[in-house]
């Protein structure tokens, strides 16, 4: 009996879904010819919770605790975009002190997100030591968050018009101490990782994206800047107080997994520079614009001032979203996080569209892994840096 050797026997392998604390509930259906990847189909939706529809049935203040469940490793950014949307829609002014506090919290959150990308990324490549190092630094950031907000994760700290509470006494000194310590940690990472020949063999030239491809696919964040495009919303479209600080956009021109690693490590250095400047320059004054708490809903004449008979409790301070639409965006650790908001003169948004960076960056994965080896899938997927909470929403 002779077997035909002309037909290639392809193998279909399911990768994932993994636990949300690891790579997330992403399923990849991979078609293999030996160890060569022929095709890859991502299956999404395992963590879909209807976040956009929930927003349309809540006021913004009621919805704030939900948004930290999008990207649960960079929760300050989801809170920032949620309060920025109604602030821009209603032209609510932010006190300068509140803006500086927001910048400090956002950059600390950026560092924490990049750290928790770096550790598992290195573990995927077989390097276990950095995985334990990053948790040491991340723990210090979470201690700062806990002292300022009361929560290590899911902070619920941002408010429309400012922040929930001022920074406690001595917090800024601890923050500066962390900055000095962390800069030494970044040097340690680079000595341990960047010049490691085994690491370079795994990432150099793997997952190449040209600048033109990155723009055509709509990529953002480190994925875009690693392909030679110097696009950072903190410089291009400044928000909060970023235009008052001296820092540089981190970018590389190689477009491979190594370039994306170098961009994120460079961003951690720049975040420290921004935090140090913000702490030194932070002005005094209020930390919240209390005008945003005014309840502006007009009385209904049909009730004839008898509302109190039908209300079980006094309504919380809120305001109506005027009948207009806008798109706001921030530079999150993974890319451009945006909100398309449509108001219709009611307390609830008529439309709340989330533009998650991870969802759009993930679309290029099948193209990147084709004609690569099976082991390169985890390298490429790790270099994209996705969180399924924001991908599936």
From Swiss-Prot:
This is NAD(P)H-quinone oxidoreductase subunit H, chloroplastic. It is a peripheral membrane protein. NDH shuttles electrons from NAD(P)H:plastoquinone, via FMN and iron-sulfur (Fe-S) centers, to quinones in the photosynthetic chain and possibly in a chloroplast respiratory chain. The immediate electron acceptor for the enzyme in this species is believed to be plastoquinone. Couples the redox reaction to proton translocation, and thus conserves the redox energy in a proton gradient. It catalyses: a plastoquinone + NADH + (n+1) H(+)(in) = a plastoquinol + NAD(+) + n H(+)(out); a plastoquinone + NADPH + (n+1) H(+)(in) = a plastoquinol + NADP(+) + n H(+)(out). NDH is composed of at least 16 different subunits, 5 of which are encoded in the nucleus. InterPro entries: NADH_Q_OxRdtase_suD, NADH_UbQ_OxRdtase_49kDa_CS, NDH1_su_D/H, NiFe-Hase_large. GO terms for molecular function: NAD binding; oxidoreductase activity, acting on NAD(P)H, quinone or similar compound as acceptor; quinone binding. It comes from the Eukaryota. It comes from Sorghum bicolor (Sorghum). One of its GO terms (biological process) is photosynthesis, light reaction. The keyword Iron does not apply. Coiled coil: none annotated. HAMAP family: NDH1_NuoD. Its EC number is 7.1.1.-. It is found in: Plastid, Chloroplast thylakoid membrane. The keyword Endoplasmic reticulum does not apply. Belongs to the complex I 49 kDa subunit family. Keywords: Chloroplast, Membrane, NAD, NADP, Plastid, Plastoquinone, Quinone, Thylakoid, Translocase, Transport. One of its GO terms (cellular component) is chloroplast thylakoid membrane. NCBIfam families: PRK06075.1 (NF004739), PRK07415.1 (NF005649). Pfam families: Complex1_49kDa.
